[in-house]
């Protein structure tokens, strides 16, 4: 089992009130379905399994993101919800095909 990352945040490990604000992914999914999400949620994968970091299978991480996104989008609160997916790592997987060159900038100005 992964070490919950909230335990590395100063003051959380010693505070039962703060620890109570952290829930499992299962609870998050249930809260989303019931329209009980708080004003702000920060969702993390199990880093030893569900992340997209090397050497994990990135498809598992993609499924995790899809499951979270689907739950939020099907929530009764979706109409007034913003969903941001961010990364703190760039991956580490090599793409054997170089990206295409950038488009040539236009010399005309558009108004």
Summary of predicted features, one role per range:
Residues 1-111:
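N-terminal pro-sequences and low-complexity stem/linker regions of secreted or lumenal proteins
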């Amino acid at each position: 089992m992964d070490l919950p990352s909230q335990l590395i945040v100063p003051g959380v490990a010693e505070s039962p009130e703060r620890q109570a604000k952290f829930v499992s992914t299962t609870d998050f999914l249930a809260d989303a379905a019931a329209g009980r999400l708080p004003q702000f949620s920060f969702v993390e994968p199990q880093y030893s399994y569900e992340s997209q970091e090397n050497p994990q299978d990135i498809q598992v991480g993609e499924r995790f993101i899809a499951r979270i996104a689907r739950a939020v989008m099907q929530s009764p609160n979706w109409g007034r919800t913003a969903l941001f997916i961010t990364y703190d790592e760039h991956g580490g997987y090599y793409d054997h095909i170089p990206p295409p060159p950038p488009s040539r900038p236009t010399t005309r100005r558009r108004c």
